[in-house]
Structures are given as structure tokens and as C-alpha cells.
Amino acid sequence: MTATFDNLSAGDVIDGPKFAVSRESIRLFCDASLDYNPLHLDDDYMKGNFGKTNFGGIIMHGMNNFGLISRMLTEWASPAGAIHRRLETRWVKPVRPGDTIQPSGIIKAKQATEKSRWVLIDVVVKNQKSEKVATGEAMVEFPRDLFCQ
């Protein structure tokens, strides 16, 4: 069913597609973003310590999580004419080749104003072990019909 502002409630869940992370997908994101940081490409470099952290191998770009969340929100909102307006995220755990991650969201609140209607969504990306790898908050606008005002 297409999401409409009126049929949404706090607690409703939005599920995004699963994404299998591979060395190739990490490399493709490097190419797309022009970010060739050794964090994402060089296993030997990543065996060193970064402060108190040792990653033990390459990790996926955090912004790749951002893209997966954006895709989920856009695919959910667009059929209803809604617009993904804001996304704030925090990376909480590294993602490695071989992980399968999936974004999801839970509607936190909705609000109607004179000019538009807004939905606030708590978002999370989890790996195959159900560990959170990214968390955040998104805002989606369900514009009022301009012809009815």
C-alpha cells in the first residue's frame, strides 16, 4: 500500500532493501565518490592502530549507509508524492566486506502545518547479526495539494 500522510501512525515501520557488501561494492563507491582513502582499499594499512581502534581490514564508506537510507526513504515516499527533506546519521559500527546490511525506519511523529505535512522518522541500518551500524533521524514532507489551497 502506498504511504499517505493520513494513514501513517507513530510506530509504523519502513523496511529498506538488503545490501550485500563486497570488496567490489566498496571499490565502486570509491570510484563514485572519488574517495580513495586507504580505510576502504588497503588491508595492510587497516591492520594498524588508529588511536585505540584496530579495524583489522578495510571498511565500507559511512556515506554508503547514508545512500541506502536515502534510497529506502525515497522509494517509500515518492509514490505518494512525498519528498525526503532531511537526514542526519551517525556511524556506530564499521561495515566490512561480507556483511549484509539493511536500513529501516520507524515513524516517530507526524505534524500538519498550514503549508505542509511532515513525518519524522528514526532510521537505523543493521548488519546480518542485527547489530546497529548506523542510526539517525529523517524528515519527509507530504506537500498539501497546491490546487486545494
Predicted regions and their residues:
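Short structured motifs
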Residues: 1-2, 86-92
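N-terminal start-of-chain detector that recognizes signal peptides
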Residues: 60-63, 73-78, 93-98, 110-113, ...
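Short C-terminal domain-edge/linker segments immediately following a structured domain
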Residues: 46-51, 89, 134-139
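Hot-dog-fold acyl-thioester-processing enzymes
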Residues: 1-83, 145-149
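HotDog/MaoC-like acyl-thioester-processing domains
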Residues: 1-13, 96-149
